[in-house]
Amino acid sequence: MILDEIVQKTREELENRKKEYPLEWLGRSLAYNPYMPRDVKKALQSTPERPYRIIAEVKKASPSKGIIREDFEPVSIAKAYELGGADALSILTEPHYFKGNLEYITQVRRYVPMPLLRKDFIIDSYQILEALVYGADFILLIAAALKASELKELLEYARHLGLEVLVEVHNKEDLTKAIWAGADIVGINHRDLQTFEMHMNLCHELIPLIPQGKIIVAESGLSSPKTLEELHGIGVDAFLIGEHFMRQKDVTQALLDIYPLNKK
């Protein structure tokens, strides 16, 4: 089970980080936190001018594909996404399987104005405090990696700190947990994180079960304008796209190609 393996590795890494940077250190860092929160929900909600939104991902590697982008420079990539009209950025911070780094959030935030997502396997409130200290505006919580009570507790803690939360689901059980926990932003991941198999009909199956008023984000396997138009037509507000962009030499043009209306 790939997800279980990653979560276990995350637990081990987390224990080391807590020793190196105790909770008290993170708490003191907040006193000097220079970051003003950026409006995540506004960035992701549909408008007549921008019927759907793009969360563009800064990602070097993945467990299923290995290294995706050799010439990986997070700030340059972020600037290119801004030129292409990205509404928010997802930044991988998991170091072992995705070759991410928390510092990427801090580096990128200095140069682009859009909200930043800490994309990681968050299982502890310590990681949420880290996200705030390093400059994230919202975090990812994966329903399959958490008990319902844990999901609710972490979601409420993030909101207490002023962070928004994207709750990722892959099946009806995950969705039930997400809704019960109070998720406002629901991410439907076409990729099963236990097997890494793709299920591209998942939005069609789950969207009818989502209460009105939620922001719906589709994730994984997205590479064509036709797919985006189709999924927007059934209720998707935003699309999180990573690998497709990361494999293109010109990520600005890749973004404009997939969303021609993306010239804000």
UniProtKB/Swiss-Prot annotation:
Give the protein's recorded name.
Answer: Indole-3-glycerol phosphate synthase
- Lyase in keyword set: yes
Q: Which organism is it from?
A: Wolinella succinogenes (strain ATCC 29543 / DSM 1740 / CCUG 13145 / JCM 31913 / LMG 7466 / NCTC 11488 / FDC 602W) (Vibrio succinogenes)
- Which keywords, in A-to-Z order, does the entry hold? Amino-acid biosynthesis, Aromatic amino acid biosynthesis, Decarboxylase, Lyase, Tryptophan biosynthesis
Keyword Lyase (UniProt): yes
EC assignment? 4.1.1.48
Citing just one GO molecular function, the answer is: indole-3-glycerol-phosphate synthase activity
Task: List, alphabetically, the InterPro entries matched.
Answer: Aldolase_TIM, Indole-3-glycerol_P_synth, Indole-3-glycerol_P_synth_dom, Indole-3-GlycerolPSynthase_CS, RibuloseP-bd_barrel
Q: In which pathway does it act?
A: Amino-acid biosynthesis; L-tryptophan biosynthesis; L-tryptophan from chorismate: step 4/5
